[in-house]
């Protein structure tokens, strides 16, 4: 069973390989927080995910298929993605979320949307993270013990792994050179442009 939606975000750093690395085929976990799903791929297999162009979104499919979150439509209950478990990647290669603990370095990405008011239920546990206002993207820290990964909002004294709060407003034209440059992917404006492009909301500039 898929833990995450691979065609939206594979949870690994930028690259055409499964984990953005070249070389022989290798086996790795599919970004699963439990590390219980494995997949093997060859280096010439292109993973067509948003992660490969610096932005991605993943959602806990396993929890969804387990009916952890449902909605009623027409008298029938349908499983839905739990908004408390959506995760966003921007500039995944250049924002390396490695955290060294007990001489072990992990490469998992753990950026979460944090909402001041949002909370959700996931597999019987309550979480205070939700895919709410992207302006409240907080800096997280990730701790890994065996196959278990815990992610919580970091404080100034923690070993920080992700972005601090994104700027409150990112206008499409605020930083065109950097946003459109393929040499500066750790760039919130570029990620915003890409997302706006997917949504068809970037204005077309006409040079008269």
Swiss-Prot record:
<feature type="region of interest" description="Disordered">
    <location>
        <begin position="97"/>
        <end position="172"/>
    </location>
</feature>
<protein>
    <recommendedName>
        <fullName>Putative adhesin P1-like protein MPN_468</fullName>
    </recommendedName>
</protein>
<feature type="compositionally biased region" description="Low complexity">
    <location>
        <begin position="100"/>
        <end position="132"/>
    </location>
</feature>
<feature type="compositionally biased region" description="Low complexity">
    <location>
        <begin position="159"/>
        <end position="172"/>
    </location>
</feature>
<comment type="similarity">
    <text>Belongs to the adhesin P1 family.</text>
</comment>
<feature type="region of interest" description="Disordered">
    <location>
        <begin position="29"/>
        <end position="49"/>
    </location>
</feature>
<feature type="compositionally biased region" description="Polar residues">
    <location>
        <begin position="145"/>
        <end position="158"/>
    </location>
</feature>
């Amino acid at each position: 069973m898929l833990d995450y939606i691979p065609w939206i975000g594979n949870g690994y750093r930028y690259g055409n390989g499964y984990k953005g690395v070249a070389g022989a085929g290798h086996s790795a976990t599919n970004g699963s927080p439990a590390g219980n799903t494995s997949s093997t791929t060859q280096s010439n297999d292109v993973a067509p995910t948003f992660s490969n162009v610096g932005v991605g979104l993943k959602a806990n499919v396993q929890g969804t298929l387990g009916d952890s979150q449902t909605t009623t439509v027409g008298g029938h209950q349908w499983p839905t993605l739990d908004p408390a478990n959506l995760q966003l990647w921007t500039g995944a290669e250049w924002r390396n979320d490695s955290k060294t603990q007990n001489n072990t370095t992990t490469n998992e990405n753990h950026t979460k949307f944090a909402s001041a008011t949002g909370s959700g239920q996931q597999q019987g546990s309550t979480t205070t993270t939700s895919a709410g206002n992207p302006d409240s993207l907080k800096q997280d820290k990730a701790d890994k013990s065996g196959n278990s990964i815990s992610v919580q909002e970091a404080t100034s004294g923690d070993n920080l792994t992700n972005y601090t709060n994104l700027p409150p407003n990112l206008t499409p034209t605020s930083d065109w050179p950097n946003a459109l440059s393929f040499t500066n992917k750790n760039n919130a404006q570029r990620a915003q442009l890409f997302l706006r492009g997917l949504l068809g909301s970037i204005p077309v500039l006409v040079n008269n």
